[in-house]
């Protein structure tokens, strides 16, 4: 019999008062996260931002349904976060974008193309944005979800 674990908060796990059997054939959904990926880039609205460049901080979350790695312990059965970093770095440095929205969308599309993810969240932030006010950072988050292929609904005439 396997133990059921209950999540309390983001980082702690505890056993519930009663033990429950877990279906060993079930694959839980896994979130692969990369936080604090720092890449020097040349993105921005102003020509100066594009010429001089600046550091961007990325946060990524990939929702991996039916992740086999929970059973196999093989990196090829999940999302390799090293490869995630490579994809982000390439997308962020191969050309310049005026908006973080576009950059985040390009990164999310590439991650969805490469990995079998249900959804991808990409956040890019400028730790020192070119604004005349004291701010900790300015950032954008884009979420892409894989669409479900639906059969036309005859009742709706679609």
Name each model-derived stretch.
Residues 2-158:
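N-terminal, polar/charged subdomain of small-to-medium soluble alpha/beta proteins
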